[in-house]
Amino acid sequence: MNTISSVFENLDKQCALIPFITAGDPDLVSTGKALQILDSYGADIIELGLPYSDPLADGPIIQEASNRALKQGINLNKILSMVKTVNMTIKAPIVLFTYYNPVLHLGINNFIYAISNAGIRGLLIPDLPIEESEYVISVCNLFNIELILLLAPTSSRERISKIIKRAPGCIYLVSTTGVTGQKSQLTSQLKELTETVKTMTNKSIILGFGISTTEQIKEIKGWNINGIVIGSAFVKRLSGNVPEAGLEQIQSFCQDAKNAIIS
């Protein structure tokens, strides 16, 4: 399995495709199959969401997926056991998306050790205060986990600079205020923010929250972005069908998304 940094290095100027799916929805076996399908049909990095009872940054599609997974008794140990097995068959590094409370509940060191031992390569904590990130980064570095920091569109230039300096690797630029979900259009303000951030750092920039169509992908790839995260569009296809049909749909959409990037 590749590291996150090596993916961006190997892609050079090509944009990375980063699908997001919720672990355990519609079931954990399907999640494992979905990881393999995404890896085979164009994903460069894969975000895997840890189901959580109060997902403040997530839109309704991902919230519902998280609730369904929790009702099945899906937990971190079951997810990591599945990941450890699947990791042997895929190249795309997995980034675990989790809220801060589950990390604190288990203990920062214990949590990061556990995900590293399962083969997780990256960690994304949307509600991690930048003021508390230094220790988390130090533990992640110890266990070869790349912590990805988020940058909101409402951030001041001073805060942008602070996050850029603190970020150990790539930076996740949130495309909209509010929660994740499918948005009908992208704003010129977002493009300007992207250009501003790119002038302030050479670190890789990935863009997510609200990207759901191949038209949006084609538009964004021209912004000199290093990676595009697509979440709700994949989760909706996977969870809105019987498992076999959902897997077929994410395979097709993953191919379409990749073609939109490389075309």
UniProtKB/Swiss-Prot annotation:
Pathway given in the UniProt record: Amino-acid biosynthesis; L-tryptophan biosynthesis; L-tryptophan from chorismate: step 5/5
Gene3D superfamilies linked: Aldolase class I
Record's keyword terms, sorted: Amino-acid biosynthesis, Aromatic amino acid biosynthesis, Chloroplast, Lyase, Plastid, Tryptophan biosynthesis
Keyword hit for ATP-binding: no
Entry GO CC: chloroplast; cytosol
Catalyzed chemical reaction(s): (1S,2R)-1-C-(indol-3-yl)glycerol 3-phosphate + L-serine = D-glyceraldehyde 3-phosphate + L-tryptophan + H2O
PROSITE patterns: TRP_SYNTHASE_ALPHA (PS00167)
Active site: E47, D58
Classification via SUPFAM superfamilies: Ribulose-phoshate binding barrel
GO MF annotation, one: tryptophan synthase activity
Main function: The alpha subunit is responsible for the aldol cleavage of indoleglycerol phosphate to indole and glyceraldehyde 3-phosphate.
Name listed for the protein in its UniProt record: Tryptophan synthase alpha chain
Source organism (scientific name): Pyropia yezoensis (Susabi-nori)
Gene it is expressed from: trpA
